[in-house]
């Protein structure tokens, strides 16, 4: 789980650079992410379980996974016109409750006295996340981004749900291994977006930028593979990945001496306390 956080933090910083400095749009970023990650995954696939059952469930998993990834990037582009990436990650705190409830419903986690404490720590982490989000002080037009925001949250939650549903370690039912379904989903995305992006022209005009973004997807491969493993074991742990990335980015901001309010610092500390408390219980 910590490895996922480290890898995705690197990718978050590189994506920010790609948008701010290289001026890549959502389609270009999604294509580079999908194509480069799928290509790099070829080196890992021979060592993966590569479970594939010829059934509608396997193809459904691939299509649904491709859809969630496409929605994630497309909707994020709309939402980020009104709020920062930092604030968007804070909103993912809502999925913590949904994910742990899913673990309880599926039998991955047992309902008991510890569940009360876990929900309390989830609530604590969520409070910290929203404090961080509000620390920016910018007025956000939620009427404009309400539907995209809901769709984005459902896409992030749905990705983990797809993995746990089509390859459940608890029940022993697995139609397609998470890594293999992700690989086919990324290939599908790359093929669909290629006509819009014009890859050859892109690499000719922005060679260094496109190569930089592509190479930074090496940690993305490691992160995605490990994320899939986490999602098959626990939806709650999967949901905690993004808040942990938020906390890491928060500390990076402190190290770089970026402007930071008291509300921001307090939110970071509270969020960390919630994450640690959840893992301990």
Please tell me what each predicted stretch does.
Residues 1-24, 117-123, 139-175, 222, ...:
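Glycine-/small-residue-enriched transmembrane alpha-helix faces in small-molecule transporters
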Residues 1-4, 32, 42-45, 50-75, ...:
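Loop-to-transmembrane-helix transition segments
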Residues 76-79, 95-117, 229, 247-266:
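C-terminal transmembrane-helix exit sites in multi-pass transporters
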Residues 37-55, 104-110, 127-139, 165, ...:
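Membrane-interface helix-cap regions at the ends of transmembrane helices
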Residues 3-14, 21-71, 121-127, 176-199, ...:
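Transmembrane alpha-helices of multi-pass small-molecule transport proteins
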Residues 21-27, 75-91, 108-111, 168-175, ...:
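Structural motif at transmembrane-helix junctions in multi-pass transporters
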Residues 34, 38-41, 93-104, 114-135, ...:
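Hydrophobic transmembrane alpha-helices of multi-pass small-molecule transport proteins
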Residues 9, 13, 66, 70-74, ...:
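Hydrophobic/small/kink-forming positions within alpha-helical transmembrane segments
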């Amino acid at each position: 789980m910590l490895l996922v956080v480290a890898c995705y933090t690197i990718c978050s910083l590189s994506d920010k650079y790609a948008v701010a400095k290289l001026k890549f749009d959502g389609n270009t970023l999604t294509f580079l992410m999908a194509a480069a990650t799928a290509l790099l995954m070829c080196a890992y696939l021979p060592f993966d379980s590569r479970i594939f059952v010829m059934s509608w469930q396997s193809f459904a998993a691939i299509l649904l996974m491709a859809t969630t990834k496409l929605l994630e990037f497309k909707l994020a582009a709309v939402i980020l016109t009104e709020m920062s990436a930092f604030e968007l990650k804070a909103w993912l705190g809502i999925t913590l409750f949904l994910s742990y409830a899913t673990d309880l419903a599926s039998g991955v986690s047992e309902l008991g006295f510890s569940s009360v404490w876990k929900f309390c720590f989830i609530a604590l982490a969520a409070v910290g996340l929203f404090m961080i989000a509000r620390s920016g002080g910018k007025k956000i037009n939620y009427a404009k981004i309400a539907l995209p925001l809901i769709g984005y949250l459902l896409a992030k939650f749905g990705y983990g749900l797809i993995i746990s549903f089509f390859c459940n370690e608890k029940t022993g039912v697995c139609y397609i291994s998470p890594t293999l379904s992700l690989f086919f989903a990324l290939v599908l995305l790359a093929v669909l977006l290629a006509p819009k992006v014009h890859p050859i022209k892109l690499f000719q005009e922005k060679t260094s930028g496109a190569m930089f973004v592509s190479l930074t997807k090496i940690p993305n491969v490691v992160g995605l593979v490990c994320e899939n493993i986490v999602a098959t074991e626990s939806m709650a742990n999967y949901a905690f990945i993004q808040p942990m990335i938020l906390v890491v980015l928060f500390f990076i901001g402190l190290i770089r001496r970026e402007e930071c309010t008291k509300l921001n610092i307090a939110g970071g500390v509270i969020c960390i306390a919630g994450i640690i408390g959840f893992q301990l219980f």
